[in-house]
């Protein structure tokens, strides 16, 4: 287990080593946030770039396409052919989906997609949440992530990782009290002073460390007193495995975001546009010079005022205007720079709701957009598949290590109802072997639905597989049961309608009226209403009524169709026992 001093030294080394990469990330962040300064003295100091920010457009569009569909965990049965193994596998899948839903994984994937494409890295740490008794995913900013170097670039599990964030002095004092003020070097402190926090994660422990203020010679003795770093929290890692997962974008040798190459072009385009605006402004408000005549001293006797019709009067000289016109190649240069940005960052015009001038048909537009976007989306989704696989294994290890024998409850998300099941982690997680896969990596939600429909039409895919792949269907098994129930209900309704139009059929007006009232007024289901109507008819037909009673009349129904109750027969001879009893009396 590393000491506080070793962790701080490790942080300083990694911060220096990651300096160039983090500087590039900060430039991407500044451009994405619009914090771009065009270095021209003629511009107002508060002026912003007045050109389209293609980086934001491309980053948002690509990230939304990557995260428009969610992957699905697949847990194969441990023993093939065993119904118990199949049931356990289904329960493991539902439990993992419930954990994802508890962590709002859909929203986290949207943020992680932006990190992966913009920063070339997506970092997440999993920790036990003792309030909800579930593993908790926390998405971390790649700018605040310092992972241990790995030999394999595809290895997403560093041996240890340091995450940083800033905390205010008021929060530290409120949370940790005298432990902070008595031991840490606080410097010139006020309630808004902020201190760097180090969150160290490895296979043995989770540690939280706060760094003291810089040892500035300008501080007095009391302000310089205290430790450089102080350990605040220590939690043993019972899982025995690293809890941080750092996914990197696939590049040649060093981290590089998808839009790193467009930044220089953007600055050039913004500067050229700014120069054009300056030239146009000077053309509207030209610079004027009072040129003296030979041997005369020029003087302006009266300033011109065009609004009031006042003429200007000049003595001893002439006023000349210096006209500046933008170059005729300026617009061509701006268009060329924009085109180069789109080519470099794979940002087609369709992202902005436009289309290239060489696109004549919708089919051609789809082909161009697919060639530009699909394979990049596929690669990003494949990266997330591998990352989520490792994250799920960590989540399973957390469940077994911290709540192995605790009976837990998970809820199966559904749009109409919520299913509830109980499980014990040590029993259900008999293995962590599984797959995480997108239904069709490289496809966004729109093209995925079209592809599923085409495969169903050609018979290449079963309806069950299509339901599992459709992102709009949260529970394929429940959807299958609903489809069967709707089909049977439709067949039952058709049967009732066909029998009702036949006057000699079993459904007579009174029975149909009773059936309709059960469905409309008492909110009974169709199958329950039919069952109750049938039982009512059976009871009526089994009860004999006296001759001439209203119940024996057919009413609106045809006679003999079962609408009337049977008539009681004539009384027969009394039984022998009754006669003997009378004689005995």
Give, region by region, the residue ranges found by the protein language model.
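Extended, helix-rich architectural segments
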Residues: 1-183, 335, 528-530, 534, ...
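Intrinsic-disorder-associated interaction segments
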Residues: 1-21, 36, 40-55, 78-89, ...
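C-terminal anchoring/interaction modules
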Residues: 2-6, 13, 291-585
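Structured, contiguous alpha/beta core segments that scaffold functional sites
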Residues: 2-3, 9-16, 117-121, 127-327, ...
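Long, contiguous amphipathic alpha-helices that act as assembly "spine/axial" helices in icosahedral shell
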Residues: 16, 20, 51-59, 64, ...
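Generic detector of low-complexity/intrinsically disordered segments
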Residues: 33, 45, 174, 186, ...
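Generic N-terminal simple sequence motifs
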Residues: 35, 67-73, 138, 145, ...
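Intrinsically disordered, low-complexity segments enriched in proline/serine/threonine
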Residues: 41, 73-79, 144, 151, ...
């Amino acid at each position: 287990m590393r000491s506080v001093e070793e962790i701080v030294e490790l942080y300083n080394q990694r911060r220096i080593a990651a300096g160039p990469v983090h500087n590039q990330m900060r430039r991407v962040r500044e451009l994405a946030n619009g914090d771009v300064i065009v270095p021209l003295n003629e511009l107002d100091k508060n002026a912003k770039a007045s050109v389209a920010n293609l980086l934001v457009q491309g980053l948002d569009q690509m990230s939304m396409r990557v995260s428009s569909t969610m992957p699905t965990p697949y847990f194969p049965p441990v023993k093939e052919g065993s119904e118990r193994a199949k049931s356990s596998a289904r329960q493991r899948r539902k439990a993992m989906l419930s954990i994802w839903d508890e962590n709002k994984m859909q929203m986290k994937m949207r943020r992680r997609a932006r990190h992966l494409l913009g920063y070339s890295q997506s970092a997440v740490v999993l920790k036990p949440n003792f309030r909800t008794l579930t593993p908790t995913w926390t998405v971390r900013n790649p700018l605040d992530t310092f992972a241990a170097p790995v030999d394999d670039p595809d290895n997403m599990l560093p041996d240890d990782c340091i995450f940083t964030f800033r905390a205010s002095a008021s929060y530290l004092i409120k949370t940790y009290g005298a432990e902070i003020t008595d031991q840490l070097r606080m410097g010139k402190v006020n309630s808004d002073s902020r201190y760097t926090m180090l969150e160290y994660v490895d296979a043995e422990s989770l540690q939280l460390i706060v760094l003291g203020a810089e040892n500035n010679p300008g501080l007095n003795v009391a302000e310089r007193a205290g430790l450089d770093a102080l350990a605040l929290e220590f939690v043993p890692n019972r899982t025995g495995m690293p809890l941080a997962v750092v996914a990197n974008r696939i590049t040649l040798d060093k981290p590089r975001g998808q839009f790193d190459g467009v930044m220089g072009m953007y600055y050039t385009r913004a500067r050229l546009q700014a120069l054009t605006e300056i030239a146009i402004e000077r053309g509207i408000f030209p610079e004027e010079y009072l040129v003296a005549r030979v041997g005369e001293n020029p003087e302006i006797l009266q300033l011109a005022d065009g609004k009031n019709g006042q003429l200007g009067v000049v003595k001893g000289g002439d006023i000349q205007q210096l006209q500046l016109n933008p170059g005729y190649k300026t617009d061509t240069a701006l268009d060329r720079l924009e085109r180069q940005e789109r080519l470099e960052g794979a940002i087609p015009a369709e992202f902005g709701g436009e289309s290239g001038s060489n696109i004549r048909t919708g089919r051609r537009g789809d082909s161009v957009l697919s060639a530009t976007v699909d394979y990049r989306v596929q690669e990003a989704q494949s990266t997330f598949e591998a990352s989520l696989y490792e994250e799920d294994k960590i989540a399973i290890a957390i469940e077994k290590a911290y709540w192995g024998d605790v009976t837990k409850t998970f809820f199966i998300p559904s749009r109409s109802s919520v299913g509830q099941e109980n499980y014990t982690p040590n029993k259900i997680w008999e293995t962590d072997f599984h797959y995480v896969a997108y239904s069709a990596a490289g496809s966004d939600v729109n093209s995925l639905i079209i592809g599923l429909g085409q495969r169903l039409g050609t018979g290449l895919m079963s309806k069950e597989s299509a339901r599992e792949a459709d992102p709009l269907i949260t529970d394929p098994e429940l959807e299958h049961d609903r489809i069967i129930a709707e089909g049977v209900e439709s067949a039952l309704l058709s049967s009732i309608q066909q029998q009702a139009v036949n006057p000699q059929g079993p459904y007579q007006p009174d029975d149909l009226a009773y059936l309709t009232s059960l469905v409309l007024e008492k909110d009974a289901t169709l199958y329950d209403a039919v069952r109750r109507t049938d039982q009512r008819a059976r009871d009526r037909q089994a009860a004999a009524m006296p001759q001439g009673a209203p119940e024996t009349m057919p009413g609106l129904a045809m006679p003999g169709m079962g609408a009337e109750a049977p008539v009681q027969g004539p009384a027969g001879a009394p039984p022998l026992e009754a006669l003997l009893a009378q004689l005995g009396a």
